[in-house]
């Protein structure tokens, strides 16, 4: 239904209906509000081939909400394309995604985003949860990811893949990389595992002290609560101006706040008398 003018147009490959002003469209559990709705009908079957909502678009289906300037639904591919010149928004339970363009697949729950964007999770904190990287012991279940390349989200396997110019924020820790794969809990969006590669740079704040780590790959999972940083030939950990460690493999045990280095490495430590000490 709409409060404005309804226009009909007949073309060789489709019949077109255009609804204007305060449009509301419902089908099953889905509802779409928009300023304009254009429906393309197959001239033979008289069934909908494609529908384009434009203007201030707000769509909902169960716990899922989508906002943007354009929403295109294609019957053949069973996918919806959500677009906005600024940022389109997709919300599902504890998951929030923003990007200029999103492709949402109905049957698989897959989301493809070919443009820069951000992903945020907002789950309730649970006692005993630790950070997914860095060494702070603050419990935090939320993760914020920004990327400059693209993102693919697979709801069936609860995975998200990110590429290029990635920034991951978790409490007071930042992870920068160019490739990232994260998995979430089956029942919510608590972070279950993470694997990052290419241009790894971790910045962690603990009180007034900043520590940094650099390497080629970092992994973490919720079972053992250990962050594993590797580098070729070395990964590097620097704790302010007090200590620097070079090793092929550095493990951060978050429950005990300990660090283990594997392989041949080097430790540089500044003594209280400001003289440097080196161990290999």
PLM regions and their residue ranges:
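N-terminal amphipathic/hydrophobic interface segments
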Residues: 1-280
């Amino acid at each position: 239904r709409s409060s404005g003018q309804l226009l009909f147009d007949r073309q060789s490959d489709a019949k077109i209906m255009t609804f204007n002003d305060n449009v509301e469209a419902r089908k099953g559990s889905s509802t779409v509000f928009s300023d304009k709705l254009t429906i393309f009908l197959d001239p033979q079957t008289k069934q909908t081939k494609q529908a384009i909502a434009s203007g201030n678009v707000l769509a909902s289906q169960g716990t899922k909400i989508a906002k943007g300037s354009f929403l295109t639904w294609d019957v053949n591919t069973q996918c919806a394309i959500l677009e906005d010149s600024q940022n389109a928004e997709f919300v599902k339970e504890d998951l929030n995604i923003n990007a200029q363009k999103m492709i949402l697949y109905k049957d698989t729950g897959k989301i493809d985003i070919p443009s820069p964007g951000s992903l945020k999770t907002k789950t309730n904190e649970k006692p005993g949860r630790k950070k997914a990287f860095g060494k702070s012991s603050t419990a935090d279940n939320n993760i914020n990811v920004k990327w400059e390349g693209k993102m693919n989200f697979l709801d069936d396997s609860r995975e998200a893949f990110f590429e290029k110019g990635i920034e991951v924020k978790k409490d007071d820790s930042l992870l920068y990389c160019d490739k990232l794969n994260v998995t979430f809990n089956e029942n919510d969006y608590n972070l279950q595992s993470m694997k990052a590669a290419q241009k790894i740079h971790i910045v962690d704040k603990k009180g007034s002290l900043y520590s940094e780590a650099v390497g080629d790959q970092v992994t973490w999972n919720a079972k053992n609560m250990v962050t594993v940083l590797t580098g070729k030939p070395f990964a590097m950990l620097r704790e302010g101006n007090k200590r620097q460690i070079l090793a092929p493999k550095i493990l951060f045990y978050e429950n005990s706040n300990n660090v283990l280095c594997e392989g041949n490495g080097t430790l540089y430590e500044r003594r209280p008398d400001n003289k440097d000490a080196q161990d290999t």
